[in-house]
Curated annotation (Swiss-Prot):
Protein name: Acylphosphatase
Gene3D superfamilies to which the protein is assigned, alphabetical: 3.30.70.100
E.C. designation(s): 3.6.1.7
Active-site residues (renumbered): 18, 36
Enzyme type, top EC level: hydrolase
Keywords per UniProt: Hydrolase
Family assignment from sequence similarity: Belongs to the acylphosphatase family.
Domain Acylphosphatase-like stretches: 3-91
Pfam families: Acylphosphatase
Length: 91
């Protein structure tokens, strides 16, 4: 199992980006979380699952929901032991 950490930059706060992320993650069977960062413009996403599914998820993060304007996605990978039981939004 792999872990994807993505910091999504651009107009991604206040446009339902975290809700979109959660919906797509659940649809793909991924676990982890999405949270706004204190920068006021970035969202951090942690997702665990099979690498092929995580790559599909990453494509979705790069496009985002209709009102989002994703400018950049910083990505890092690691292995995981399944730290999360579901996918949720952190507040």
């Amino acid at each position: 199992m792999h872990c994807l950490k993505a910091v999504v930059k651009g107009k991604v706060q206040g446009v339902y980006f975290r809700d979109f992320t959660r919906t797509q993650a659940i649809r793909l069977g991924l676990c982890g979380y999405a949270q706004n960062l204190e920068s006021g413009t970035d969202v951090e996403v942690i997702a665990e699952g099979d690498k092929d599914i995580l790559l599909e998820f990453l494509k979705l993060l790069r496009s985002g929901p209709p009102h989002a304007e994703v400018q950049e996605v910083e990505v890092s990978w690691s292995s995981t032991n399944g730290n999360y039981g579901d996918f949720h939004i952190k507040y």
